[in-house]
Each structure stands twice: as C-alpha cells, then as structure tokens.
C-alpha cells in the first residue's frame, strides 16, 4: 500500500469517527431523520473503508484483523443487540456459521 492510499484510508476512518460522534450527539434527539441520515452515512463510509482495505492490502490476511478492529470499535453496540428476522437471508447465513463453524 502506498502512502497516498494509507492516508486516504486513515482519512476515511477519521470521517467515520466524526459521524459516530454525531450519532452519539443526536441519539437522544427527537429527530429520527438526523439519526437515520448519520447511520446511513456511517454505513456507506464503512463499506467504502472495507472495500479500500481489501483492494489495497496486497492480499495480506492481516487486513482481516484491521477490519475486525474496526467493527469492534464502531459497531460493537449494534452487534451486541443484533436480532435477525426469521425470514432474513442474513439469519440463514448466521445459522450456517453457528451450525457448521462454531
């Protein structure tokens, strides 16, 4: 990974951190619209970050550790309160992991 890509990725992480702080700031607000917009922005930036990490990591498996750190930092609360609908395809994938790889 060259220096430009590194700094670009670090900038994305900083931007996600700023959005996360705005989410905390607006979590008790009466406006679900603001909260929803920040959540969407955080998710878009997160998707972009993961894509950038995967495409610029020179196929190093250590990038998965960095992604894990990112998820634990910025999505830990969401993961701890996660409940899939029974018909959700993600629930089916989760079930396969639990049944076969736990």
Model-derived features with residue positions:
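Amphipathic alpha-helical coiled-coil segments
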Residues: 43-62, 77-82
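Short, Lys/Glu-rich amphipathic helical modules
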Residues: 20-38
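Non-transmembrane alpha-helical oligomerization segments
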Residues: 16, 42, 49, 63, ...
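Non-transmembrane amphipathic alpha-helical segments
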Residues: 12-26, 45
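Short, charged, amphipathic alpha-helical segments
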Residues: 32-44, 64-65
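Amphipathic alpha-helical binding modules
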Residues: 66-102
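Short, charge/polar-rich alpha-helical segments
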Residues: 1-13
């Amino acid at each position: 990974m060259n220096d430009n890509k590194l700094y670009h990725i670090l900038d994305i992480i900083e931007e996600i951190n700023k959005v996360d702080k705005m989410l905390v700031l607006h979590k008790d607000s009466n406006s679900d619209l603001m909260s929803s917009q920040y959540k969407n922005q955080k998710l878009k930036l997160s998707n972009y970050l993961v894509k950038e990490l995967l495409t610029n990591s020179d196929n190093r498996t250590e990038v998965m550790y960095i992604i894990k750190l990112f998820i634990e930092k910025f999505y830990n609360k969401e993961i701890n309160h996660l409940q899939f609908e029974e018909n959700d395809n993600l629930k089916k994938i989760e079930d396969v992991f639990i049944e076969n790889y736990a």
